[in-house]
């Protein structure tokens, strides 16, 4: 169970302290009518000036008298809104699972089902997850067995709407437009505000509860995995194994910004000439002389969808040999190969003018696409990546009477991420190690129990790493792009070199030597 956060845990001013600051600013001329009334973001004073200016049904929203103004400000002074209590929930998550197993000496089965439900810690935040697993083992004969595994999961999640952050390259400031993160809002919003009132953000009416209802995201995640492994023991001490697996993962993120969200309203907020000229979400057509800013979203909202897909194939074949000679010599040998192929995709689409209250009917304005063309922005993208890896490996261990142990490992690996030259794309890595268990020697009995364990060990290895995933210039990376052009009739597509070819791009290698001692005292009560 998760409890709501509490303001006692934070050093945040209450509404009375905040109103004292506002009143001081107003008395010094910082909160005058002309600036606050048309401000892009305003709270108590902005709402007060809007009420004073609003005239309907034969009267003003708020009388422009000292008594009425002081009464309005006094209400805000004593409001002390607990945003954590309003935006957060005391949530209890539920997990339910059931499993079944049965079988005989020839075949055994295991299945399980589970369901999880989390109502969420904040408004418009919830998760449901469902999983299923099956594992079947068939002993076809004493030498041959087949293991089949299947698993699937589905996750449905809801979250407040959000846009990607941007960085001001001059000041280094990180900002996020139309941010409605409940935790950030509760920490940074004045407690003098009325949770049921609409204030101003981005030149448009804003209420956090209303915005969470009209600006949210739905995530649907599906994972599938199928695996089969065949084992064959042609001899008592030899085992062959072949494993194949397929994994699929897909994620769909749907961002619904309805007609009545603050984000949609901001694209058509132009109550007067001052607001119209200052609103950055309006568009001025450069092809029309002396044109005024206008809305590229006269009706509807946005429907943005991002899809991630992944398909992975794995195959591994191995052989192992384990034997003991004369009860003193232990040999373990293991070798095999592995092939991995992974395809990933990402698509993004920006649906403009979606009318959610009109049967999801799109009604787009051509100027939106004209503006995007002039700003060199995209309204849909497609990305694909392919990864291919092959590896051959072997390891061997020899032990004599448990006293002396020698181990060796070698791996020969290649990846399409690295340079096309054979020495760069393929790299052998290896490890050699040894250990001497002195406590197994006969002379060690004279040292017990004071010295109960003593092992000397050493290893030397060459390890490697393929490096960061974003480094892929084993061949020249050439991407298409749209050069910036101020007018739509002179647009063109170009190619530019992102990274020059590095045909010698290879693994990050590391040679490592380790020498150590393990010591135990007083029947291993103290170990070093």
List the model feature ranges, each with a label.
Residues 186-190:
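GHKL/Bergerat-fold ATPase module in large chromosome/replication-associated machines
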Residues 1-124, 162-164, 213:
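Residues embedded in well-ordered regular secondary structure
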Residues 157-174:
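Low-complexity intrinsically disordered tracts that form flexible linkers/tails across taxa
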Residues 179:
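Conserved, non-catalytic sequence blocks in retroelement Pol enzymes and Pol-derived host proteins
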């Amino acid at each position: 169970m998760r409890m709501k956060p509490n303001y006692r845990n934070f050093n945040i001013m209450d509404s009375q302290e905040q109103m004292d600051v506002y009143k001081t600013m107003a008395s010094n001329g910082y909160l005058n009518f002309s600036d606050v009334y048309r401000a892009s973001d305003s709270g108590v004073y902005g709402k007060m000036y809007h009420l004073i200016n609003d005239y309907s049904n034969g009267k003003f929203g708020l009388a422009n008298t000292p008594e009425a103004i002081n009464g309005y400000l006094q209400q805000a002074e004593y409001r002390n809104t607990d945003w954590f209590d309003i935006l957060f929930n005391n949530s209890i998550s539920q997990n339910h699972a059931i499993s079944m197993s049965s079988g005989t000496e020839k075949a055994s089965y295991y299945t399980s089902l589970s369901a999880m439900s989390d109502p969420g810690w904040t408004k418009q935040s919830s998760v449901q997850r469902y999983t299923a697993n099956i594992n079947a083992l068939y002993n076809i004969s004493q030498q041959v067995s087949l293991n089949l595994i299947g698993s699937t999961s589905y996750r449905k999640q809801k979250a407040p709407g959000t846009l990607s952050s941007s960085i001001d390259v001059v000041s280094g400031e990180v900002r996020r437009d139309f941010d409605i993160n409940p935790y950030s809002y509760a920490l940074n919003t004045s407690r003098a505000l009325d949770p049921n009132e609409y204030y101003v953000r981005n030149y448009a009416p804003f209420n956090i509860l209303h915005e969470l209802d009209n600006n949210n995201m739905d995530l649907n995640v599906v994972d599938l995995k199928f695996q089969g492994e065949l084992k064959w023991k042609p001899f008592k001490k030899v085992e062959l194994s072949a494993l194949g697996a397929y994994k699929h993962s897909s994620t769909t993120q749907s961002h619904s910004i309805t007609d009545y969200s603050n984000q949609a309203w901001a694209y058509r907020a132009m109550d007067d000439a001052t607001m119209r000229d200052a609103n950055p979400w309006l568009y001025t057509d450069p092809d029309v002389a002396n044109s005024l800013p206008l809305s590229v979203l006269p009706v509807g909202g946005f429907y943005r969808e991002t899809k991630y897909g992944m398909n992975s194939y794995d195959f591994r074949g191995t052989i192992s040999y384990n034997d003991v000679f004369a009860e003193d010599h232990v040999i373990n040998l293991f070798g095999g190969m592995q092939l991995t192929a992974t395809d990933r995709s990402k698509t993004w689409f920006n649906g403009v003018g979606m009318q959610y209250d009109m049967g999801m009917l799109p009604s787009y304005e051509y100027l939106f696409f004209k503006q995007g063309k002039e700003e060199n922005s995209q309204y849909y993208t497609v990305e694909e990546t392919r990864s291919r890896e092959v590896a051959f490996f072997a390891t061997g261990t020899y032990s004599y009477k448990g006293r002396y142990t020698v181990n060796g490992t070698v791996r020969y690996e290649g990846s399409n991420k690295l340079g096309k030259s054979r020495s760069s794309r393929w790299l052998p890595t290896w490890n050699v190690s040894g250990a001497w268990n002195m406590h197994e020697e006969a002379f060690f009995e004279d040292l017990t129990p004071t010295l109960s364990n003593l092992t000397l060990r050493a290893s030397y290895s060459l390890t490697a790493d393929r490096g960061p995933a974003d480094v892929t210039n084993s061949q020249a990376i050439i991407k298409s792009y749209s050069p910036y052009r101020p007018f739509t009739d002179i647009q063109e597509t170009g190619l530019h070199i992102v990274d020059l070819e590095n045909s010698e791009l290879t693994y990050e290698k590391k040679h490592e030597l380790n020498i150590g001692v393990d010591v135990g005292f007083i029947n291993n009560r103290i170990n070093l």
